[in-house]
């Protein structure tokens, strides 16, 4: 389980990116993190694995306070934190299998890493994961020949090869079409349930978050303003998170000037 207590982040400019964030994410739960740009969502993910150092507060992962670890201890702890990135972070010239196996580079010695020599058990697990994410036919295909959805599946398999306890997912569907986005979110959900993973997903697509997350946390100006189930994310709650907007509108409405311009154009033809 992940527990975050009173986490704050102040940048050297004085700007507060996070203000006393307190959360618990139990094993097996998929939590979606929503909010406007600049709300602190990406900063929160990066503070959890200490890619960004928090200013104050604590981050507990299965009984270990990550904020108190030294460099060596943090390196060990990060093995239990899988990251899935919006931009996939694949090595384009390497094959699917080589990219997946790169998730194990921190587990083997220098020479094994240098020559990319992995234990047979690790290779077998990589093949099993490729089959699980739907890429069993593409182990030797180069990453630069894959579609966006396939690349994201490689990223998921690579993260799972670490055998993580926590999965941090940053905008996994930002570059994907609606059908592929649903497939990726469904896959993440299934894997979290199968493996008992705590999952935090930073996502801008609110309807997609409501469809697949068991819990939604809304951030605004670095503070938690909503924490609850998807079905309670009403228009008034969305206004609190994002600011005033007509959340019931079905599409863009033309203002009176646009309508007048259209009418004038029709009249002249």
From Swiss-Prot:
PROSITE patterns: ABC_TRANSPORTER_1, ABC_TRANSPORTER_2, PHNC. Belongs to the ABC transporter superfamily. Phosphonates importer (TC 3.A.1.9.1) family. One of its GO terms (molecular function) is ATP binding. It comes from the Bacteria. It catalyses: phosphonate(out) + ATP + H2O = phosphonate(in) + ADP + phosphate + H(+). Its main location: membrane. This is Phosphonates import ATP-binding protein PhnC 2. The gene is phnC2. It is found in: Cell inner membrane. GO terms for cellular component: plasma membrane. Disulfide bonds: none annotated. Its EC number is 7.3.2.2. Part of the ABC transporter complex PhnCDE involved in phosphonates import. Responsible for energy coupling to the transport system.
